[in-house]
Amino acid sequence: MTSPLENLENHLEMFIENVRQIRIIVSDFQPQGQNVLNQKIQSLVTGLQEIDKLKNQIDVNVPLEVFDYIDQGRNPQLYTKDCIDKALTKNEEVKGKIDSYRKFKSNLMKELSETFPVEISKYKAIRGDE
């Protein structure tokens, strides 16, 4: 038994193939091909009805930005790549901030140890940093 997602994929592939065949028929239309065209269009409508029936079996949230990519003629898979690139950039920024805070803490502890050695010793003992 196929999963609902696989079933939807199969129906979408059949729909796309139907559209491709209709495009071929229409691009070189001959009057004797009217019956075939009508059958293909009916098959297209039936396919859309089948796809519509499957919508309740699958809960997929597609970010609106993906549709923007499609509207702009871009590959929707680039959206995933762009999201990963943005996450990587943000991760590098956060890592830089963490490293800066660690250096600041280290320098601060060093300076405070020189200025207030007794208090810093007590602080380190309480924190368990020794």
Swiss-Prot record:
The keyword Coiled coil does not apply. It comes from the Eukaryota. Keywords: Activator, Nucleus, Transcription, Transcription regulation. It holds the Pfam family Med10. The keyword Protein biosynthesis does not apply. One of its GO terms (biological process) is regulation of transcription by RNA polymerase II. GO terms for cellular component: mediator complex. GO terms for molecular function: transcription coregulator activity. Its main location: nucleus. It is found in: Nucleus. Belongs to the Mediator complex subunit 10 family. Component of the Mediator complex. Component of the Mediator complex, a coactivator involved in the regulated transcription of nearly all RNA polymerase II-dependent genes. Mediator functions as a bridge to convey information from gene-specific regulatory proteins to the basal RNA polymerase II transcription machinery. Mediator is recruited to promoters by direct interactions with regulatory proteins and serves as a scaffold for the assembly of a functional preinitiation complex with RNA polymerase II and the general transcription factors. This is Mediator of RNA polymerase II transcription subunit 10. It comes from Anopheles gambiae (African malaria mosquito). The lineage of its organism: Eukaryota, Metazoa, Ecdysozoa, Arthropoda, Hexapoda.
